[in-house]
């Protein structure tokens, strides 16, 4: 991974822990997790809106087709 050996990664993690401390890293992890959760929630809501729009368009198209068929039958 990134040209680093496992030993180098462990040393890097230890240095990061020493610099930032576990409390700051825990808070940063919590903040990152909350941001990801919010992003996923927004994506789901956006999908629901799109689905509702597609359903309304499908309903409009179906009703327009029915009206068109009725007009052709009456003609």
UniProtKB/Swiss-Prot annotation:
InterPro entries per record: TatA/B/E, TatA/E
Quaternary structure note: The Tat system comprises two distinct complexes: a TatABC complex, containing multiple copies of TatA, TatB and TatC subunits, and a separate TatA complex, containing only TatA subunits. Substrates initially bind to the TatABC complex, which probably triggers association of the separate TatA complex to form the active translocon.
Name of the protein in question: Sec-independent protein translocase protein TatA
Compartment(s) where it occurs, according to its Swiss-Prot or TrEMBL record: Cell inner membrane
Similarity comment: Belongs to the TatA/E family.
Role noted for this protein: Part of the twin-arginine translocation (Tat) system that transports large folded proteins containing a characteristic twin-arginine motif in their signal peptide across membranes. TatA could form the protein-conducting channel of the Tat system.
Membrane topology category: Single-pass membrane protein
Keyword terms: Cell inner membrane, Cell membrane, Membrane, Protein transport, Translocation, Transmembrane, Transmembrane helix, Transport
CC annotations in GO: TAT protein transport complex
GO biological process, one term: protein transport by the Tat complex
Residue ranges crossing the lipid bilayer per the database entry: 1-21
Lineage start: Bacteria, Pseudomonadati, Pseudomonadota, Gammaproteobacteria, Pasteurellales
GO MF terms held by the record: protein transmembrane transporter activity
């Amino acid at each position: 991974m990134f040209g680093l050996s496992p030993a180098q990664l462990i040393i890097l993690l230890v240095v990061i822990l020493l610099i930032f401390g576990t409390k700051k890293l825990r808070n940063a992890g919590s903040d990152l997790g909350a941001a990801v959760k919010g992003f996923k929630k927004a994506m789901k809501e956006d999908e629901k809106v799109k689905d509702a729009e597609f359903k309304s368009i499908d309903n409009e198209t179906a009703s327009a087709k029915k009206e068109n068929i009725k007009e052709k039958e009456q003609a």
